[in-house]
From Swiss-Prot:
The gene is gcvP. It comes from the Bacteria. InterPro entries: GcvP (IPR003437), GDC-P_C (IPR049316), GDC-P_N (IPR049315), GDC_P (IPR020581), PyrdxlP-dep_Trfase (IPR015424), PyrdxlP-dep_Trfase_major (IPR015421), PyrdxlP-dep_Trfase_small (IPR015422). It comes from Escherichia coli (strain 55989 / EAEC). This is Glycine dehydrogenase (decarboxylating). The keyword Oxidoreductase applies. Keywords: Oxidoreductase, Pyridoxal phosphate.
């Protein structure tokens, strides 16, 4: 039969690229699970009353090439002015070797958070390097492996200061008046829910205020002034006040370390180390503290430990501080951080080394000195005598200066009374400085760069002598070896080879949605039209961004059934926080601010109770019944008991137990009956898109993990995006922004992240995914995700019982394998199975969540039947190995499972095990072998002997 032109054009071609199983494979799997079609399977599994009659209208699919061309046209509407706005954001030069070998490399960007350290040693080493950079530059003892952005880090510093403060009755937090405005905005938002009073004043007046538990200072103020706070910090310390200092990472190359001046906490943005501005993000924040406060720090910390053979190995340390373990008692709700961006910054430091970084910092400062000298020579006045890269220039004709700047396609900071701000960066050249002279002085100024350079080279007083760094930085060999591109390329490749990412195998982590991050989706993030915009540039310069964001928001509104979407939250956990704040402020607007009880099912993600605590709510746990569903009797009792104090419920759908609960609408009705709101966690949205929606179900607000459902890669632990969808009554209460007003969202609420649209530069990934899939493809993706999970469950059921199922014995998009009976019978645990899977070439499923002693498997729609069968065969082979232990063929204390994973060194060492080397490293005929570089980690040793900085190179060899 002759095909039509429309068929030959094949606009839906990408759907077949994204979805792993082809039509024949899908039919084979449908036959295996006893379903006639995808629609029939979906109809059996999803409750009838929440199934959409028609898919959301998000348009027809587009080919990769058509979508790229369409988005390129949108991006071209952005105007790439040279921005000297500063305020924590500058242009950068990302070394091409890092661009090509990391940012554009799926071996780096498709990996998951390194909960399984044996398959994560490469990025763990890069993160340890990031921590070493932080330690060297801040002068403190302990550093984290990144936070979401500088403003979030400031809020975390405030919360940490209260945790460690000895002044238990003090409830006021002092913020110096020259911190960045967006930082103050986020601090105020966080302080409100914690019940702290924020005082903003000149830093030198801090001692005038009573009952202060913590202070936030900024080493280089927002308008450029370098502060020597040594004496002030000493006085504050004598009064037991916890001191936090915000610092500029590039300035720290030249300036004295705040830690050496007595600061307790130092933080800032690592954006200047090679990460483009991207209209606000994503960027990693660095965070450091004194050793005595290490167990109160927020976020991931990488530590040096030992493996089972006694070799040096890296792992995430002190995880008992974190939300996935401590829940509402955690130090923060941080789950996703900014690992990929932290690793870019880390490798930027490795590539340039201390000499290169000093050259860059000195060049920036020299050009700033030259600019200052020329302006002063012509009679203009500077507000500050001491500066690093930022000048605050008083101008009589400010309007004229700004007009000339616009004509020259230059952005200056314009929000300072009777002055403009100018921040230089590593991209600034002498030609740029001459342009600035022309803008500020007119064309006939007669200034000469070389003449000015000679003057300032011999007489620069812009950095106080006491503020100049007098110690060496980055002395570890890793920062002094890889400076040729060949060496750098090989070092990065050596790290990549240690890790297991989606470019090698499926990552079947339940509740994580490790789906394809298509190359066509990733390409636009490197376009300069998206990468080079300052987040506070005039809105008319960002029309492309505004169009793309508006279109993406419209699609998400239709897909979620909500009325509005706020793009600001930088992660899923931050989206939870923002959504709960919207609920809180909604209640307050109705004079019901007393509503502060948040109901959370026992099966919830750890971020849920941690976020509720951050939002100032009390957590009350709702029981689950024997089938894993919310116990409606207990829910009604808890809701009735809460009464007028009920704020909301946080519920995940499908549930974290991997089933579509039949009573989800009744759950919503019960909560609404008692005046509460329904927060539907979007973690499992990949099983909803096109089939049902949170709004249709009856929820009021949800966050969306764009790094799960909508294809932003996990990056080894970030970046992520967690925009929130809300019903109309909550729309006025989503986050706002003090610097940039968000068009279409008329809200005066505080910000939750530094930039108005969060990590805006990765939003094109989700735009591309939705555009290429269209309504038809998005629904099919959800259906195939469900099919793949049911195929795995049906084939493994006899070997590993599926703990929870819904109607007809079906699961949703993931399934929980119950290992507890096997452990009781044989002594082999879920941990042993997880580590043995490494020998078979797989990342482990999620361990012991949401039920201890289980493995939760989520295959996503992107894995083909071939890969699913490979995983299933590995699991069945492992079950056969467990039977060998059960039969006594291998002793419990010495078998391939308890000794897993196995490494290459063992092949040439003495072999005393009762199983062969072949069984150890080539089980079940594994051909395309992934080799872990370390054996099983000793977690206890790592936490008892905490060491979180670089170790000698010899330790890795």
């Amino acid at each position: 039969m002759t095909q039509t032109l429309s068929q030959l054009e094949n606009s839906g071609a990408f759907i077949e690229r994204h979805i792993g199983p082809d039509a024949a494979q899908q039919q084979e799997m449908l036959n295996a699970v006893g379903a006639q079609s995808l629609n029939a399977l979906t109809g059996q599994i999803v409750p009838k009353d929440i199934q959409l009659a028609t898919p959301p209208q998000v348009g027809a699919p587009a080919t990769e090439y058509a979508a790229l061309a369409e988005l390129k046209a949108i991006a071209s509407r952005n105007k790439r002015f040279t921005s000297y706005i500063g305020m924590g954001y500058t242009a950068v030069q990302l070394p091409p070797v890092i661009l090509r070998n990391m940012l554009e490399n799926p071996g780096w960007y498709t990996a998951y958070t390194p909960y399984q350290p044996e398959v994560s040693q490469g990025r763990l080493e890069a993160l340890l390097n990031f921590q070493q950079v932080t330690l060297d530059l801040t002068g403190l003892d302990m550093a984290s492996a990144s936070l979401l952005d500088e403003a979030t880090a400031a809020a975390e510093a405030m919360a940490m200061a209260k945790r460690v403060s000895k002044l238990k009755n003090a409830n006021r937090f002092f913020v110096a008046s020259d911190v960045h405005p967006q930082t103050l905005d986020v601090v105020r938002t966080r302080a409100e829910t914690f019940g702290f009073e924020v005082i903003v004043d000149d830093a030198q007046k801090v001692l005038d205020h009573q009952d202060v538990f913590g202070v936030l200072l900024q080493q280089v103020g927002t308008t450029g002034e370098i502060h020597d706070y040594t004496a002030l910090i000493s006085e504050l310390k004598s009064r037991k006040i916890v001191v936090s200092v915000a610092a500029d990472i590039m300035a720290l190359v030249l300036l004295t370390a705040p830690g050496k001046q007595g600061a307790d906490i130092v933080f800032g943005s690592a954006q200047r180390f090679g990460v483009p501005m991207g209209y606000g993000g994503p960027h990693a924040a660095f965070f450091a503290a004194k050793d005595e406060y290490k167990r109160s720090m927020p976020g991931r910390i990488i530590g040096v430990s030992k493996d089972a053979a006694g070799n040096t190995a890296l792992r995430m340390a002190m995880q008992t501080r974190e939300q996935h373990i401590r829940r509402e008692k955690a130090n923060s709700n941080i789950c996703t951080s900014q690992v990929l961006l932290a690793n870019i910054a880390s490798l930027y430091a490795v590539y340039h080394g201390p000499i290169g970084l000093k050259r860059i910092a000195n060049r920036i400062h020299r050009l700033t000195d030259i600019l200052a000298a020329g302006l002063q020579q012509k009679g203009l006045k500077l507000r500050h005598a001491h500066y690093f890269d930022t000048l605050c220039v008083e101008v009589a004709d400010k309007a004229g200066v700004l007009t000339r700047a616009e004509a020259a396609e230059i952005n200056l900071r314009s929000d300072i009374l009777n002055a403009v701000g100018i921040t230089l960066d590593e991209t600034t050249t002498r030609e740029n400085v001459m342009q600035l002279f022309n803008v500020l002085l007119g064309d006939n100024h007669g200034l000469d760069i070389d003449t000015l350079d000679k003057d300032v080279a011999h007489d620069s007083r812009s950095i106080q002598p006491a503020m100049l760094r007098d110690d060496e930085i980055l002395t570890h060999p890793v920062f002094n070896r890889y400076h040729s591109e060949t060496e750098m390329m090989r070092y990065m490749h050596s790290l990549e080879r240690k890790d297991l990412a989606l470019n090698q195998a499926m990552i079947p982590l339940g509740s994580c949605t490790m789906k394809l991050n298509a190359a066509a989706e990733m390409i636009p993030i490197t376009w300069p039209e998206f990468a080079e915009l300052h987040p506070f540039c005039p809105p008319e310069q960002a029309e492309g961004y505004q169009q793309m964001i508006a279109q993406l928001a419209d699609w998400l509104v239709k897909l979620t059934g909500y009325d509005a979407v706020c793009m600001q939250p930088n992660s899923g956990a931050q989206g939870e926080y923002a959504g709960l704040l919207a609920i809180r402020h909604y209640h307050e607007s109705r004079n019901e601010g007393h509503r502060d009880i948040c109901l959370i099912p026992a099966s919830a993600h750890g971020t849920n109770p941690a976020s509720a605590h951050m939002a100032g709510m009390q957590v009350v746990v709702v029981a689950c019944d024997k089938n894993g569903n919310i116990d409606l009797t207990d829910l009604r009792a808890k809701a009735e008991q809460a009464g007028d104090n009920l704020s909301c419920i946080m519920v995940t759908y499908p549930s974290t137990h991997g089933v579509y609960e039949e009573t989800i609408r009744e759950v919503c009705e019960v909560v609404h009956q008692f005046g509460g709101q329904v927060y539907l966690d979007g973690a499992n949205m990949n099983a909803q898109v096109g089939i049902t929606s949170p709004g249709f179900i009856g929820a009021d607000v949800s966050h969306l993990n764009l790094h799960k459902t909508f294809c932003i890669p996990h990056g080894g632990g970030g970046p992520g995006m967690g925009p929130i969808g809300v019903k109309a009554h909550l729309a006025p209460f989503v986050p706002g922004h003090s610097v940039v007003q968000i068009e279409g969202m008329l809200t005066r609420q505080g910000a939750v992240s530094a930039a108005p649209f969060g990590s805006a530069s990765i939003l094109p990934i989700s735009w591309m995914y939705i555009r290429m899939m269209g309504a038809e493809g998005l629904k099919k993706a959800s259906q195939v995700a469900i099919l793949n999970a049911n195929y795995i469950a049906s084939r493994l059921q006899d070997a590993f019982p599926v703990l929870y199922t819904g109607r007809d014995g079906r699961v949703a998009h993931e399934c929980i394998l119950d290992i507890r009976p096997l452990k009781e019978e044989t002594g082999i645990s879920e941990l042993d199975i997880a580590k043995r899977l490494i020998d078979y070439g797989f990342h482990a499923p999620t361990m012991s969540f949401p039920v201890a002693g289980t493995l939760m498997v989520e295959p996503t729609e992107s894995e083909s039947k071939v890969e699913l069968d490979r995983f299933i065969d590995a699991m069945l082979a492992i079950r056969a190995e467990i039977d060998q232990v059960k039969a006594g063929v291998w002793p419990l204390e010495d078998n391939p499972l308890v000794n897993a994973p196995h490494i290459q060194n063992e092949l040439v060492a003495e072999w005393a095990h009762p199983y062969s080397r072949e069984v150890a490293v080539f089980p079940a005929g594994v051909a395309d072998k992934y080799w872990p570089t370390v054996k099983r980690l000793d977690d206890v040793y790592g936490d008892r002997n905490l060491f979180c900085s670089c170790v000698p190179i010899s330790e890795y060899q």
